[in-house]
Amino acid sequence: MSHKIQGGSVVEMQGDEMTRIIWELIKEKLIFPYVDLDLHSYDLSIENRDATNDQVTKDAAEAIKKYNVGVKCATITPDEKRVEEFKLKQMWKSPNGTIRNILGGTVFREAIICKNIPRLVSGWVKPIIIGRHAYGDQYRATDFVVPGPGKVEICYTPSDGSPKTVYLVHNFTESGGVAMGMFNQDKSIEDFAHSSFQMALSKNWPLYLSTKNTILKKYDGRFKDIFQEIYDKQYKSQFEAQNIWYEHRLIDDMVAQAMKSEGGFIWACKNYDGDVQSDSVAQGYGSLGMMTSVLVCPDGKTVEAEAAHGTVTRHYRMYQKGQETSTNPIASIFAWTRGLAHRAKLDNNKELSFFAKALEEVCIETIEAGFMTKDLAACIKGLPNVQRSDYLNTFEFMDKLGENLQLKLAQAKL
């Protein structure tokens, strides 16, 4: 390349353990040699989050709000063991949750597909992108054990002082049982709808919302009605212009349809459905190491991309002992490419758009040419049958990607 591409403003969040090492390699070998970025870096390592009382996470989220593009390395969400290991002041919350709460928006997961990596669902030749509405429902519910016979009622008391409304949930006559009250908010459902419609337009794929509105006529019916109203008023003409569509589906029909389909659609799920189906779909494609995660805000303008996997602690322990590792960097690389592609779209930067696409193609072409990490070799041959000659180690694979990217960009005469 005769010159560096001017990339614009990007917020970068460093992470923990093996993914932190890979993150630095990605910047050094694949990004910085070709792209000149106005980079705003935040160290989200567990040590720095502890040192700053997690203020660094909030600062990073505010920076994403300002610059509209964030790329994030995987981070540790501490449990009791981690609190002990790092002598933390407290059990800090998930950085992803903190960022999502500040930005709003919906998390969309998408599989990265290579022809030579077998899929459990062989018919899925295109990704299925799942958008999970990560607010409310069972996750904010009040549930309790009903100790014995009696009535369970739900009461709504209007804040304007008008009469309250009481609904009978169940009259327990012979014994107790269990009960739950859950909720969602129109504003949150509206934001979920906008993020989903924006994602469909950007991918140029159809969108399906799944609910069980035949049973939960009012509750799930509200999701269905809000989506339909927003679609008809604000998105229908854009969808038709792009020759894509939006449809509501019953969750059981949708699950069956997804299994039979070839992929190539966005699936908007309520909170619990999204929790379950995103893992089920991820497994169907074969590997979490090949799964991207993108937070899309309702404005369609603000995006944060990351890998859908963790910090790969087991490999980091090996790395610390000086042992060889073969850690898959693909999802972390795609966090960068998705972030840069969005930056390119916002700025109408054709060179940057080409670069992001070229780097994604290099990743897939390299694997399809037989150069891969151990986890992918295991997908093909089965772990007990994998020999050392079947895969590259962490650093060899990054070098191979670097070589192939250099070749591709030279051929393109950028």
Curated annotation (Swiss-Prot):
Mn(2+) binds at residues 252, 275, 279. NADP(+) binds at residues 75-77, 82, 260, 310-315, 328. The modification N6-acetyllysine is found at residues 81, 224, 233, 321. Its EC number is 1.1.1.42. One of its GO terms (molecular function) is isocitrate dehydrogenase (NADP+) activity. The keyword Iron does not apply. SUPFAM superfamilies: Isocitrate/Isopropylmalate dehydrogenase-like (SSF53659). It catalyses: D-threo-isocitrate + NADP(+) = 2-oxoglutarate + CO2 + NADPH. Keywords: Acetylation, Cytoplasm, Glyoxylate bypass, Magnesium, Manganese, Metal-binding, NADP, Oxidoreductase, Phosphoprotein, Tricarboxylic acid cycle. GO terms for biological process: 2-oxoglutarate metabolic process; glyoxylate cycle; isocitrate metabolic process; NADP metabolic process; tricarboxylic acid cycle. The modification N-acetylserine is found at residue 2. It is found in: Cytoplasm, Cytosol. The modification Phosphoserine is found at residue 389. The record marks 139, 212 as: Critical for catalysis. Substrate binds at residues 77, 94-100, 109, 132, 212. GO terms for cellular component: cytosol; mitochondrion; peroxisome. The modification Phosphotyrosine is found at residue 42. Binds 1 Mg(2+) or Mn(2+) ion per subunit. Its cofactor is Mg(2+); Mn(2+). It is an enzyme of class 1 (oxidoreductase). Acetylation at Lys-374 dramatically reduces catalytic activity. NCBIfam families: nadp_idh_euk, PRK08299.1. Catalyzes the NADP(+)-dependent oxidative decarboxylation of isocitrate (D-threo-isocitrate) to 2-ketoglutarate (2-oxoglutarate), which is required by other enzymes such as the phytanoyl-CoA dioxygenase. Plays a critical role in the generation of NADPH, an important cofactor in many biosynthesis pathways. May act as a corneal epithelial crystallin and may be involved in maintaining corneal epithelial transparency. Homodimer. Belongs to the isocitrate and isopropylmalate dehydrogenases family. This is Isocitrate dehydrogenase [NADP] cytoplasmic. It comes from Ovis aries.
